[in-house]
């Protein structure tokens, strides 16, 4: 493993779960029946642990990174959209016209768009666009590794640097978002490799496939797993990410690792972002305590994924857009959880009698 990457991972402190009891005691002393705010209480308690017991809890400033990259596997016919849509959507993000732009504005969340691996040369200069291209797309995972180990490590380090910059700007929460035509295919392959799932069980329509086209996508993923089997079986999670992933997926995995390094809560978006989280978790298990799955993706295989991860997403809205949209919505819930912890009165403060034990 790259020395710089190893040094970041070695510097990550696991979340102190021993603080959970103190957090719950405080929540139980607020003017409400115990547990009556449900998962908001769980969120607040986890944020308290991430903060090391420091109060008040803070989620803001919050920032979503929508990271873009192209995929060689697009040539295998696994998406109904042409590959140039990746580049077109990056321009749409920069100009404020996409779903993630609207939801970040609604939620009061900062948005940064990142070209990590799009085909073509530089984009026109734009204040909303970070241009740090690691490479121009990947090779087809159905024919060999998506990228070299060196390229994958560069993408991971890019993601780590994005988290570092967010922390330097005072952010307390970051979110993952993606853009890359065909990226449900490498994401599915990563789930199969990391979690032992079967492509036939978790491959879905992505951006709109149906019937025979989905079955073809399953076969492409099977070929990818077979041609890269020697890499996967060697058990190195970074090498597996290089073989089966994408540049934006690796960058998002680095963002997760970097968030943990800087003690930031990290909100994970949908199907693709959860693949990036899974890679980060395999590379460094301690990142898990900092991460929150924002929503249950409508991709049919996502339930099997979260079951394998033993995780519980926050929202169930039938979303399957990506871009970070679910993360932006979940950040509002996290802000609400922090405010409850910080601002609700205790029974003693309010002069309210507690329930009998």
From Swiss-Prot:
Enzyme Commission code(s) on record: 2.4.2.21
Any one biological process term the GO annotation gives: cobalamin biosynthetic process
Reactions this protein catalyses: 5,6-dimethylbenzimidazole + nicotinate beta-D-ribonucleotide = alpha-ribazole 5'-phosphate + nicotinate + H(+)
This protein's UniProt keywords: Cobalamin biosynthesis, Glycosyltransferase, Transferase
Thylakoid among keywords: no
Active site positions, chain numbering: 323 (proton acceptor)
Pathway membership, UniProt: Nucleoside biosynthesis; alpha-ribazole biosynthesis; alpha-ribazole from 5,6-dimethylbenzimidazole: step 1/2
SUPFAM superfamilies recorded: Nicotinate mononucleotide:5,6-dimethylbenzimidazole phosphoribosyltransferase (CobT)
PANTHER family named among the record's database cross-references: NICOTINATE-NUCLEOTIDE--DIMETHYLBENZIMIDAZOLE PHOSPHORIBOSYLTRANSFERASE
Function: Catalyzes the synthesis of alpha-ribazole-5'-phosphate from nicotinate mononucleotide (NAMN) and 5,6-dimethylbenzimidazole (DMB).
Family, as annotated: Belongs to the CobT family.
The protein, known as: Nicotinate-nucleotide--dimethylbenzimidazole phosphoribosyltransferase
């Amino acid at each position: 493993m790259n020395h710089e990457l190893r040094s970041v991972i070695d510097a990550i402190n696991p979340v102190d779960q021993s603080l959970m009891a103190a957090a719950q005691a405080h929540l139980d002393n607020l003017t409400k029946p115990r547990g009556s705010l449900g998962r908001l209480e769980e969120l607040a308690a986890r944020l308290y642990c991430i903060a090391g017991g420091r109060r008040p809890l803070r989620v803001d400033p919050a920032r979503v990174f929508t990271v873009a990259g192209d995929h060689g596997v697009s040539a295998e016919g696994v998406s109904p959209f042409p590959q140039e849509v990746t580049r077109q959507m990056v321009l749409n993000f920069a100009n404020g016209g996409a779903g993630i732009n609207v939801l970040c504005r609604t939620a009061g969340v900062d948005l940064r768009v990142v070209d990590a691996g799009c085909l073509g040369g530089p984009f026109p200069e734009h204040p909303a666009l970070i241009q740090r291209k690691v490479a121009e797309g990947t090779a087809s995972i159905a024919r060999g590794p998506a990228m070299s180990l060196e390229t994958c490590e560069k993408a991971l380090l890019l993601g780590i640097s994005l988290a570092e910059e967010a922390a330097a700007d005072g952010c307390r929460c970051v979110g993952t978002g993606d853009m890359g035509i065909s990226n449900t295919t490498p994401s599915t392959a990563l789930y199969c490799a990391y979690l032992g799932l079967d492509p036939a069980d978790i491959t879905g329509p992505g951006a709109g496939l149906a019937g025979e086209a989905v079955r073809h996508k399953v076969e492409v993923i099977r070929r990818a797993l077979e041609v890269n089997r020697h890499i996967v079986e060697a058990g190195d999670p970074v090498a597996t990410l290089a073989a089966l992933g994408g540049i934006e997926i690796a960058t998002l995995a680095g963002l997760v690792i970097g968030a943990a390094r800087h003690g930031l809560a990290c909100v994970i978006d949908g199907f693709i972002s959860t693949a990036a989280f899974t890679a980060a978790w395999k590379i460094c298990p301690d990142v898990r305590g900092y991460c929150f799955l924002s929503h249950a993706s409508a991709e049919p295989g996502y339930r099997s994924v979260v079951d394998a991860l033993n995780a519980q997403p926050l929202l169930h809205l039938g979303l399957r857009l990506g871009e970070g949209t679910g993360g932006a919505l979940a950040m509002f819930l996290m802000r609400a959880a922090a405010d409850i912890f910080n601002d609700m009165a205790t029974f003693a403060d309010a002069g309210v009698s507690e329930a009998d034990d």
